[in-house]
Amino acid sequence: VRVCLVSHRLGGFDGVSVAAAAWVRGFRALGWTVTRAAGFFADHEPDDVVVRGLWADRPGAAPPPVDHATISRLCRTHDLLVLDNAGSLWSAPLASRALEHHALAAGVPTVVRHHDPAWQGVVLRPVEGDVVPLHHPRHLHVVINRYTESEFAARWPELLDAKALVVRHPEVDVDGLATGDRDACRTALGVDPDEVLLAHPARVDAANKNIPGAVSFARALAAVLPGRVRYWLTDPQPGEPGPVADALAQAPGLIRGWVPRPADLYAAADVVLLPSTWEGWGLPVVEAAAAGKPVVAGPYPVLAEIRALGVTVWDPEDVGGVAALLSDPDAHRAVLAANRAAVVASLSQADLPAALADLAERARELTGTVQ
């Protein structure tokens, strides 16, 4: 089976890229071949295909004209098309529409995974008509949370009638996330063994990540713990003057910069922060739970779905609760073991290949090309 997975960008540390990489591995575990196609790649594979029109050449600019010939060829030469958020955002609506048009023309079974429907974020481009997110009932639409499922069902009930709308929570590599090197990563960051490291995996230019709120929590925790607390923002970019820069200037023991392996990030951290105002899912919450680290997150609405799966997440207002946990080794072990067990039960990538095969079959049924 030849699969083409398309996204705006691939290979980065952002949530969509990480989730897309998991699906690529899942398809390949089935013995299927996967071609990655994107407007921009942060890494490289030999068979990658750049699709003009999906990604702007300069920040803030409009995307270049859509490369219809390449999109048509990809649709005609693959057995399954996966649009991973490429049909969800207003960042490149003409490319999204072209992907849907050529997929329908070629009759290729298509899975459209929606991480961030356009109305849930900042409107980047004007869109006329009912175009984005894509919602054709001959394609299988996979949303990553129940919240978005209800929104899609209300807007396009025909998707329910066609059985073309499903929920699949993003999975994580539970075993891989437990392989981080705590000592080596902390040494590279310049963190002493007795310091409390708060890791915040976030982009400095993403307002929803609430960096000022994360710094406020770090300062409050530093005020009640006896040892030194350090705040680690993984994005090294300087950012613009304003509230974020002002907050970072007050961050305790500030550290900036990525590490290549997520497992090392979580191994190094004592607490993971994600006090976002909005997340489509919040992958670091689940990754931290899988890695056995306490996570402080919210109050974004979808977090309730992660908690409902049995994952304990601390509220940013509960500084005392986090401080007490860090001071009680027995409670720390018990709660975090329960968190890891909840992730293993419901959100492990071990089950992903079989789930992807099922999604592919459902997409074939919608297209009328059952094998």
Where are these regions (language model features)?
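A charged, aromatic-enriched C-terminal amphipathic alpha-helix characteristic of glycosyltransferases
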Residues: 317, 330-363
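A short helix/loop element that forms part of the nucleotide-sugar donor recognition site in Leloir-type
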Residues: 127-130, 177-191
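Conserved donor-binding/catalytic core segment of Leloir-type glycosyltransferases
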Residues: 5, 191-209, 215, 219
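Aromatic "clamp/platform" in nucleotide-sugar-dependent glycosyltransferases that forms part
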Residues: 277
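Short hydrophobic beta-strand element within catalytic cores of glycosyltransferases
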Residues: 285, 294-298, 313
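Nucleotide-activated donor-binding/catalytic signature segment of Leloir-type glycosyltransferases, i.e.
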Residues: 235, 241-260
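A short, active-site helix/loop in glycosyltransferases that binds the activated sugar's phosphate group
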Residues: 121-164, 172-176
